[in-house]
Every structure is written in structure tokens, then in C-alpha cells.
Design a protein with these regions (language model features):
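Class I S-adenosyl-L-methionine
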Residues: 1-101
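Conserved Class I SAM-dependent methyltransferase catalytic core
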Residues: 48, 88-92, 145-193
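Conserved beta-strand segments of alpha/beta enzyme cores
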Residues: 84, 105-106, 191
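Conserved SAM-binding strand-loop segment of SAM-dependent methyltransferases
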Residues: 104-112
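A short acidic, Gly/Pro-enriched loop at the edge of an enzyme's catalytic core
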Residues: 116-126
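A short SAM/SAH-binding and catalytic strip from SAM-dependent methyltransferases
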Residues: 126-135
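Conserved ATPase-coupling elements of RecA-like P-loop NTPase cores
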Residues: 135-138, 178
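Short glycine-enriched, charge-decorated loop/helix-capping segments at active-site entrances
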Residues: 139-144
Length: 193
């Protein structure tokens, strides 16, 4: 966020480079993404995949609904190499980087709420969901009133076939929130492994 803050002289060089390199629309999108764009460390990604391998997951249709530059795709285990990869990324620059890095993946540059994947289409939904105390506008889920992280978790669950797996990083508020509606939704639709 500091590189977007004109009031911080120690970041002036970075600020000027960003302004020069990006269109006004790209600049605003990049600045906005500093609020909730968090990239997952390779250690965490490998641990998630190790758990999936231990559960017997061998591949299939894999969804990463907030894929960033595609780190989950880049660290896909060899045992899952024949999988069909689907990614969604809201940020245009980040999404285009992912498309260049993983040209065989189907990566949509849009919000998860705008995707048209059929429920039950995926064998696995994996990722690091965006965190925040605000809602995403999705007519299918608005009535539930979920925060963005709980929205992602619940929609990921719906997108996975019966017997499929959802594996994701989320904030503590998914399990610790006073409002138990998202936990109930997840418990009714899936099984904690």
C-alpha cells in the first residue's frame, strides 16, 4: 500500500514508476487490490497439496477462485498434472500474468460472483480466499449475508461435485464468528476432513 501513498516521500520513486507503467484504470485496480490481495506462500500451498494427496486426490477439474498469478497452479503436484485447471482473478494485471504463466488453464479475469460455472462441476476447489468484513454482490448468495471470505468458502463448496474436495485458507472469522450461518451452510453441504 505504501507505493500508492503520495504522502510518503520514501516511496516516491516507486509511486512514480507505477503511475508511469499503468493506465489510470490499471493503477486504480492495483491500488484497490492492496486491501485484500494476499499471496500464499509456497510452504502453505505444498502443505495443502500434501493433505490432498494423503486424502487420495489424484486430479480432475480444479478451481482456484481467487488465483492471483497462479501459485496454486505452479505448485501442482506431478500426480495431478493431467488435471484441467480453472482460475478466476478479479485484478486485470494479475489475471493476465496468470494467463501468460499457465496458457493451458482456463483463467477468467472477473469476480468470482460473475462466473457461470455449474454447481457440482469441479472435483476440487482450492485456494486462499479474500478476507474482509464486506459482502460480494451475487444474486444467488445475497440473501445469506456472508462476508467475502465466507461467501467464497460456501460458493466453492457448491461448485464442487458430491464427493469432491474444498481446501482453502481463510481467516479465523470463518470458524470464530458469532454468526454461525456460514459454518452451518458448510456443515450441511460438506464434511470436515
Amino acid at each position: 500500500p505504501d507505493a500508492f501513498d503520495e504522502s510518503k516521500p520514501e516511496w516516491k520513486r516507486e509511486f512514480e514508476k507505477l503511475k508511469a507503467a499503468l493506465t489510470p484504470e490499471e493503477y486504480e485496480a492495483a491500488r484497490g487490490s492492496t486491501l485484500n490481495a494476499h499471496y500464499t506462500s509456497p510452504t502453505v500451498i505444498r502443505a495443502i497439496y500434501d493433505a490432498l494427496v494423503n486424502l487420495g486426490f489424484e486430479g480432475g477439474r480444479i478451481l482456484e477462485p481467487s488465483c492471483g498469478v497462479g501459485n496454486f497452479f505452479g505448485l501442482l503436484p506431478d500426480s495431478m498434472a493431467d488435471s484441467q485447471l480453472y482460475g478466476v482473478e478479479l485484478d486485470s494485471i494479475t489475471g493476465r500474468i496468470a494467463q501468460q504463466l499457465y496458457p493451458d488453464a482456463n483463467i477468467e479475469i472477473t469476480g468470482f460472483e460473475n462466473t457461470k460455472f455449474a454447481d457440482g462441476f469441479f472435483d476440487l476447489a482450492v485456494g486462499n480466499v479474500p478476507f474482509g468484513n464486506y459482502q460480494v454482490f451475487d444474486p444467488e448468495y445475497n440473501r445469506l449475508g456472508f462476508s467475502i471470505h465466507n461467501y467464497f468458502a460456501c460458493k466453492m463448496l457448491d461448485q464442487v461435485r458430491p464427493g469432491g474436495i474444498v481446501a482453502f485458507v481463510t481467516s479465523r472469522y470463518t470458524m470464530d464468528a458469532k454468526d454461525e450461518s456460514a459454518r452451518r451452510y458448510l456443515a450441511e453441504g460438506g464434511e470436515l476432513l
